[in-house]
Amino acid sequence: MGYCPNTPDEIREMLAVIGAGSIEELFAPIPAELRAKSFDLPPGMSEFELMRIMREKAAAGGAEIVPFIGGGIYDHIIPAAVDHLSSRAEFYTAYTPYQPECSQGTLQALFEYQSVICRLTGMEASNASLYDGGTAVAEAALMSLRITERNRVVLDASINPLHREIVTGYLHGLSAEAVEVAPDGCGSDLKRLIDSIDEETAAVIVQNPNFFGSVQDFSELAVKAHEKGALLIISGYPIALGLVASPGEMGADIAVGDGQSLGNPLSFGGPYFGFIATRKRFIRNLPGRIVGETIDNQGRRGYVLTLQAREQHIKRHKATSNICSNQSLCALRGLIFCASLGRKGFEELAVLNYDKAQYAKSRLTGVKGVSVMNAGTTFNEFTLSLPKDAAPVVEKLLACGVAAGVPLVQYYPGMDNALTVTVTEKRSKAEIDRLAALLEEALCS
Amino acid sequence: MQLIFEKSVPGRNGVRVPLSDVPKASPFPDALRRKEPVLLPEVSELDLVRHYTNLSRRNFSVDTNFYPLGSCTMKYNTKVTENAGGLFAGCHPFLPLLPGGERLVQGPLSLVHGLEQQLAEITGMDEVTTQPLAGAHGEMTGIMVIAAYHKARGDKKRKYVIVPDSSHGTNPASAAMAGYEIVTIPTAPYGDMDLEQFKNAMNDEVAAVMMTCPNTLGLFNPHIAEICAIAHQAGALTYYDGANLNAILGKVRPGDVGFDVIHVNLHKTFSTPHGGGGPGSGPVGVKKGLIPYLPTPRVQRKGDGSFAVEAHPEGIGRVSDFFGNFAIMARAYAYITLLGREGLIEVSEHAVLNANYIMARLKGEYELPFDQTCMHECVFSASRQLQDGVHAIDIAKYLIDRGFHPPTVYFPLNVKEAIMIEPTETESKQTMDLFIDVMLEAARIAREDPEALHRAPVTTPVGRLDETRAARAQQVCCE
């Protein structure tokens, strides 16, 4: 298939203007000994043939499995308008808006996105998005090192273990240290977290709801952290923010999380987006792109990329971070998702998630030998204790087309019987009842 | 244009949330409940659709305008690959991490593995990881791999990374994120990193050299193999920034030339759309000796032909949650499969032809600081126009009025008043001729009526925006 439009006649005309005899002559600056030793790829094909291959791969993608799994990524409704509007080519085939006059669409949308994130998190300043939830937590950790000029972060181990691994890796090269504090059951051990803060602690990082599904109040932790000159970073799950007190209300200094659940499909791992928001006084330490409001030469309101002096194209190795792009299109989807639901719908969605999970909790704990491990409130995830190892049970249920949850043992050694179950608004009562029946069957046999 | 919040009417409903089919739970505890509702806009679906449709019309894009944004490679995004990328929307990435879950997701796992193999062959590397989520994320991952390699060998004194002054700003920033100090080498009169100064800077404290070739001036560095050899001799590794790979598909493989690590920007070379600033995707390829240090997990092909997710215990750990920006990877895989060997070679040939055509036709009016055959992009300077008080930015804004997205201006930093043009392979001679005519016209207006260029753009919804005011006011969300 030829996407290159120029005809042989046109190529000849162009070569004549250049003064070259052939296209190959244009590659003359490349010494012969540096030429490719191999380029062993199959020949191209038609669209039809390609789509046949791609459909085969997608068909073996597990989309038919009923997911009661989260692990930071959630199966939520996506209003049709999200797909339609974000599929407009003027949005998806544009680049980073370096020329604001011909990029007001992207820039205003990102300004609106930043506003939505501030309102969700109870913060005053948001950037235009980061890569994903895990790297967002890592960037927040680095941000706290810059602000406090300290080199140690306290990491609550009830944070998503995939995210913890990313944070540890990011800190490693910088000779900064991440100290993990084990949870107390399925909740953060607030006392030990507070005791772990010392003069070198830049931040305490917690997640709400945490990886086990527990919702907690971190207001006191915020006060104690601030007393010792440390920051509080709360990683969160944006759908929960329709119901749960925001990081801002709890006194956090930085709020982060994965925005996937706001209108971005599962897509086997991405693209998603990370969000990060903070207090206005820390804005110069925010990594990544930021859109700001201003006026044009005739006093009309408009939007530009701002505070670019923090960024790598100007500051190079002294930049606040190496992040050069954001996840603009995914953030746009998040914005349209939130605007679609609106104030009332967003809260209703959160309540629905809570109600469905509470129903599942009562059904599943009705199964003999099964109990809930979370001590207090949960949102749409909760952790069960099974009367036997969770991993083989999950494997057995997968064969019936149900992903019953995430067995915790691979992330929390010793928690062999623990299973974290996720219930979103998309899971029907019938699916929840079937999960309970299958679980009962698997435990009896 | 009003903000969506300004169109909000209290009580107006948007999309309906599904009805509950379960009993109402006892209320969520007040102590943990948010005090203020989330003040999201209250609009009807039509309000919403009109708002974002009209916003989109305030954007230039590849599908609506010629977008010769140098070094960012804004090429046409094939439509069938968009369809292909959307096929995987329902696949949950945690499935293969569950016991017995791998067999349910053989399709997407085979795609991860397949793309890794395609990219390894294209770049001349031995293995590739798709985990990094953007080009700069790939750079950081690559440098972390290099750091792990030196550390595993007990080589602790290496604390510098060398970059040329024409490098993308992300190169030094990424190396700094991985804990290195940066040594910058100036550009020689022949348009690339000064070989003598490079030799002087190289010693056993250097961990890596980061380069791109062709470089950001669009020039192929004839000394590239020598630079790699010198680095290797001192025990340093070589990093190839794949931002400019579109110029050399099938012509040069960085792995053959002597590079140890590479990242590729799928949105640049492999036609995945950049969405107004992302998502991108930045897979990293390495030579054999570095495979152990790649991030975990890895998708491996087993003896029976099936695909498995395996931990990679010596690796640098996770750099993203799962397997990278999968739906972007699926588009790139589809693009490579669709074009095939000959199609990809044609891409580079036409990208180079088009860039040289524009360079040849504009060099009479615009200063060409490095007058050599270029690769996929060419860099002019507006220094002649500056004599009449016209800056590169004025020419850029005039192009907007004439319906063209401006080229990259003021980059690379080592060219004064730089104008960097990258047409890409998918533009026709007719489109380029129109663009060239407007560029020549801008040069004429610069001589005859420079004020006219200072006023541009006048056709856009807003005129030149006050960036200083934006930075001072720091108004980044609507109150």
From Swiss-Prot, chain A:
Query: Annotated Gene Ontology MF terms?
Result: glycine dehydrogenase (decarboxylating) activity
Identify the keywords attached in UniProt to this record, alphabetized.
Oxidoreductase
Q: Name one GO biological process term.
A: glycine decarboxylation via glycine cleavage system
- What Gene3D superfamilies would the database entry show? Aspartate Aminotransferase, domain 1, Type I PLP-dependent aspartate aminotransferase-like (Major domain)
- Judging by the UniProt lineage, the source's domain of life is Bacteria
Which reactions does this protein catalyse? N(6)-[(R)-lipoyl]-L-lysyl-[glycine-cleavage complex H protein] + glycine + H(+) = N(6)-[(R)-S(8)-aminomethyldihydrolipoyl]-L-lysyl-[glycine-cleavage complex H protein] + CO2
Identify the EC number(s).
Answer: 1.4.4.2
Q: What class of enzyme is it?
A: oxidoreductase
Name the job this protein performs.
The glycine cleavage system catalyzes the degradation of glycine. The P protein binds the alpha-amino group of glycine through its pyridoxal phosphate cofactor; CO(2) is released and the remaining methylamine moiety is then transferred to the lipoamide cofactor of the H protein.
Q: Which family does it belong to?
A: Belongs to the GcvP family. N-terminal subunit subfamily.
Describe its assembly.
Answer: The glycine cleavage system is composed of four proteins: P, T, L and H. In this organism, the P 'protein' is a heterodimer of two subunits.
HAMAP family tied to this protein: GcvPA
State the name under which the record lists this protein: Probable glycine dehydrogenase (decarboxylating) subunit 1
In which organism is this protein found? Citrifermentans bemidjiense (strain ATCC BAA-1014 / DSM 16622 / JCM 12645 / Bem) (Geobacter bemidjiensis)
List the gene name: gcvPA
